[in-house]
């Protein structure tokens, strides 16, 4: 039987189940330019409305993996574990856990992207380090993974190229918010990345893509199933993003804070999430070791320094600092009971730390430092946050975005746990 895009669209439009052959054909034909953009847009909208069965979704994800190369990481001499975060405000966990897990005997290959809107991108953060580069050849990537044990690089076009085309189309057709499509987008790249195991960190709350636990849990279960079906050991942690993670939000500010954790210090909340993620990553590849001592004794810091140097960076070079700062103060005395992650992330973006469009440049020094954290007692007029920017008008925009981010009350409230659930 000859397959056509119209037949595939009609089947899903009417609530039918696509065959593996139909799924493989339509994604291969779309990637090869034989299915028109408007036809794929129609199919994506049908998927949003009708969903995909577990079998369909497994076939869809497999076809996305098959659209490109699958990395061979078998020559590293170590068990290989990858990590993915759904993104949040102040989420610099990858900067800590990649060298930390590598210091304990695993190999950590991390292909990362750039930030858009209020959430930062790992590449943007690392590019605040003088000389650091993320564009590595396949040979450079693999050599560093073997020699150092950890590498964070820019994702190229070779892995799951169908996903890159589909995501661009979803972005302009209102078909981004679909759990099957989100799950297949993430997992196709992770499966193609070639790791033995993957730890997923799905953020939940005001500053996250998934605002509620039920949706996050559904996404987590879907991704774990896709990874397992593909032979990749997969576990997901649901972690809170109601408040920013750590105190620094912005590229250079987050690198500095990650280095504090690697020195054995840093904010308690960031340290807690990093250790929880690292424990799961190690367990996935059969390494039964507590990661905390590797932060205290400098082993993780040593791998960080080697990782940065291997990619042209100088770990001891001063990070960029903002030309202008402004302190935001408390209007009343009391306990900090809420810090709105979305408002803080938006403030950092407007200060210059993020971008509205993919082609925008970022200011590596811009961002927000939270001087008062959840549960802290503050006096009226005491500092809550410091805004960092390159231009005065940026400070005004950041100040406006941050207005109302802090709730201060007479009595403290119990803080919610940072690690909400484990799936897998």
Regions found by a protein language model. Name each.
Residues 111, 145, 153-155, 186, ...:
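Short beta-strand segments
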Residues 125-151, 221-227, 231:
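A glycine-rich helix N-cap at a beta->alpha junction
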Residues 49, 95-109, 189-194, 229-230, ...:
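Alpha-helix C-terminal capping segments
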Residues 44-48, 125, 163-172, 201-210, ...:
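Active-site-proximal beta-alpha loop/turn segments in soluble metabolic enzymes
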Residues 1-90, 306-307, 419, 424:
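Acidic, glycine/proline-rich low-complexity segments that act as flexible tails and inter-domain linkers
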Residues 7, 12, 17-19, 30, ...:
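Well-ordered secondary-structure scaffolds
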Residues 79-102, 106-118:
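Glycine/serine-rich anion-binding loops at beta->alpha junctions
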Residues 146-195:
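Phosphate/diphosphate-binding glycine-rich loops and adjacent basic-rich segments that engage nucleotide
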